[in-house]
Amino acid sequence: MSSCSASGCKATVPVALEAEKLCILHFTMEIERHCAEMRRETATGRTARERQVEIITYVGGRGELLARTATSGLHLPDELKARILNTFLTLMNLRENLDRAALRHPIGRTEGR
């Protein structure tokens, strides 16, 4: 196992996250940051369909990788388990918000009609 690439972090990178080069803590922080950015981006409901598909793919991919990491047999402290669960909730909420925004502003509908 290698060390986390985050500045100043000496934690080891689990096998499932080696391609990311991040420890579990920094991986979850990165997901949370990206989700916050995407949530702001999609809040208006005017996100292009292609971008919506990218976000849905991101949510699924990150969720799958996080699940694989969390269930790999590592002995994790309770605080890190809670952080992982919170990150799953963040991913789920982003997807739900994307769906809700799309319902409020269906693609192809224009203002003033």
Language-model-derived ranges and their functions:
Residues 1-108, 112:
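Intrinsically disordered, low-complexity regulatory regions of eukaryotic proteins
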